[in-house]
Amino acid sequence: MKAVEFLKYVLDSVNMPEDIKKLNIGQLNRLALELRSFVLENVSKTGGHLASNLGIVELTLALHYCFDAPKDKIVWDVGHQAYIHKILTGRKDKFTTLRQLDGLSGFPKPSESEYDTFTAGHSSTSISIALGFACARDMRGSDEKVVAVIGDGSLTGGVAFEALNNAGRSNSNIIVVLNDNQMSISGNVGALSRHLGELRTERGYIEAKNDVKKLLNRFPDSEKMVNKIKRTKNRIKYLFIPGVIFEELGFKYIGPVDGNNIESLIEVINRAKNIEGPVLIHVKTKKGKGYKYAENNPSAYHGVSAFDLSTGASIKKSNKPTYSDVFGKTMCSMADEDDKIVAVSAAMGNGTGLSKFISKHPSRFYDVGIAEQHAVSFSAALAKSGFRPVFAVYSTFLQRAYDEIMQDVCLQNLHVVFAVDRAGIVGADGETHQGIYDISYFTHMPNMTVMMPKNGIELEKMLRYAVYNIDGPVAVRYPRG
């Protein structure tokens, strides 16, 4: 039998998570290759989130291999990386309808499948949701496992740290998988890191630590002795062990782990399942893995329209400039003439059309991460200091910062310009991304001016008018495309 035929057989024989559990490591690795080909073939036609899904194949396989969904709950942060999960949970044959009318959603959707534990679309909430599930389980007295899968980008959102802080104090059995596919949260220091990560989670280590405590308690002044040992241990941890921040929050930390190695992932996840209390597994994956164009430029292949699989080039229906293009060009033009112009983004610089601005005026571009609330208050202080901040943001994400818009901008009548992209109906991204709520909350805020251009020419004029002719807060809202 040829290798290609065998690969087809592996994918053809897998429809539900229980099918994965019958495979050996070699077959799982072959299945990972086949899944990447399957995703590429389909997303090149339908469009969707590509690079993140190519990077998370092995991790998704390992999660479904080790856990018993839907009894065990897997909570996906944002959810745009859940394509493999959908394929493995009975939706393979519907995958050609991804993001189409009456087709599969591009995000987890409980009404679509019981394997989708929670509706997702916005970032940084998975740990909060998982902790809620875990506490509900504890009150019921049931025994299901609860896992949150969150990316390093989502970890820049403040709500994720609020949840980590709460989860660490709860001592509830919860596993957080940190999918690190871009920024290095902590460097992999090789064999020592792996050894310490394994050592600290082994039952023998935990029992030995408890035995030492009992022994020390027999001596006079044992408390002072224990405290000295703890201080020494903590100094060593800060020098050698990655992930100390998570340990300080109350988590047992395992990692970094190769997130594209199925065998290692299965071993680590199975070990984590048997640890009492909150556990964080730090996995490092390669965004865009298996498709050279996405590997070389993962940001460009984060969200894609239909494209030519052989060249990676987008199949555009029109070469007409988009509203985002016009916005970016106008921002560059104004910044060329005015050194008070500042652009602010919440991890969406490229998506909002600011690529050229970033290249031409890097010192006046601030990407604050997935932190819309922070971005608004940050922009308010820039305005208070005499600058002209323009916060470029998708409508659906700006609603997360309602309180800051009201308190920090509008009530103080500060001149912050909100460039509200993807306003109105956005189509394929579904109900979690529609930009249909901003008008209702903008128009009841004091001092706010709302402007809506009908074309690119009006957008340029309105943006300039908003920056130079209005003293208070302004929202310029424009659609996708």
Locate each region found by the language model.
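A glycine-rich helix N-cap at a beta->alpha junction
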Residues: D93-F107, R169-S186, G197, G204-E207, ...
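N-terminal amphipathic, basic-rich helices that act as targeting or association modules
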Residues: K2-T89, I245-E267, I275-T285
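Short acidic, glycine/serine/threonine-rich loops at helix termini
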Residues: I84-G90, L155-L164, I185-G197, I266-V268, ...
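Hydrophobic, small-residue-rich alpha-helical packing segments that form membrane-like cores
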Residues: T125-V149, S154-H195, R200, E207-N210, ...
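Active-site phosphate/pyrophosphate-binding segments
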Residues: I425-G481
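Long, well-ordered, tryptophan-enriched scaffold segments
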Residues: K2, L11, Q182-F327
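Cofactor-binding active-site loop characterized by glycine-rich and histidine/acidic residues
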Residues: H49-S170, K340-I341, A346, L354-S355
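Non-catalytic terminal/interface segments that mediate subunit docking, oligomerization
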Residues: K73, T285-Q399, E404-N413
